[in-house]
């Protein structure tokens, strides 16, 4: 069994009316980083996940979760 990380980053960002660039600026990362995390291309470090949770004022587990994926 392979575990994949799912995220609600796009939904939480959109709920605030923020662009990827706005979230990136608030989190101190590039827009490309936000894009790759939202699209599941890049798994964020613990520090980045916690920083995003702080910026979005959500618990980290509300943004990221493990999901089973077919091996």
Residue ranges and their predicted role:
Residues 14, 25, 54:
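Alpha-helical residues within the helix-turn-helix
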Residues 7, 17-18, 44-47:
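Residue-level signal for the short linker/turn that defines the boundary of a DNA-recognition helix
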Residues 64-71:
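Short, charged recognition helix plus adjacent turn
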Residues 1-15:
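A short, Lys/Arg-rich alpha-helix, primarily the initiator
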Residues 47-62:
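DNA major-groove recognition helix of helix-turn-helix/homeodomain DNA-binding modules
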Residues 17-35:
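Short alpha-helical DNA-recognition segment
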